[in-house]
Amino acid sequence: MNTVRVTFLLVFVLAVSLGQADKDESRMEMQEKTEQGKSYLDFAENLLPQKLEELEAKLLEEDSEESRNSRQKRCIGEGVPCDENDPRCCSGLVCLKPTLHGIWYKSYYCYKK
């Protein structure tokens, strides 16, 4: 009976000691991973502002190339009265005489082509 107790005690001691070793090993691995993660975060934190500055520079460069005259002037939407001589309907719309509605107010409206 003593041999059984000694055997179980020996197995128990080995299991505890190996379990503790595994726990220490996993703790070390976690520390290494967090240190690597921190280095990746530092790298990303340094890279992000650089990318943002590059994008901002490109956008500002494009804005400076455009002149005020190259922008599209305000246009009139669909179903809005327009002037026959100076139609400012948006792209895809044409200034036409209405068929039914609007004949009482103005003579021309913007319609789809």
From Swiss-Prot:
- Which GO molecular function terms does the record list? sodium channel inhibitor activity; toxin activity
In which tissues is this gene expressed?
Expressed by the venom gland.
Quoted from the entry, the domain comment is: The presence of a 'disulfide through disulfide knot' structurally defines this protein as a knottin.
One Pfam family this sequence matches: Toxin_22
Q: Which GO terms describe its cellular component?
A: extracellular region
Look up keyword tRNA processing and say if it applies: no
Q: Which cysteines does the record link by disulfide bonds?
A: C75-C90, C82-C95, C89-C110
Identify this protein by name. Answer: U11-theraphotoxin-Hhn1a
Which family does this protein fall into? Belongs to the neurotoxin 14 (magi-1) family. 01 (HNTX-16) subfamily.
Q: Which residues form a coiled coil?
A: none
Q: Does the keyword Plastid apply?
A: no
Q: Where is this region: Disordered?
A: 59-83
Q: What does this protein do?
A: Probable ion channel inhibitor.
Signal peptide: which range, if any? 1-21
Q: Which UniProt keywords apply?
A: Disulfide bond, Ion channel impairing toxin, Knottin, Secreted, Signal, Toxin
**Where is this gene product found?**
Secreted
Q: Which residues make up the pro-peptide?
A: 22-74
Supply the source organism for this entry: Cyriopagopus hainanus
Quote the biased-composition stretches of kind Basic and acidic residues, using this chain's numbering: 59-69
Q: What is its main location?
A: secreted
What InterPro entries does the entry give?
Toxin_22
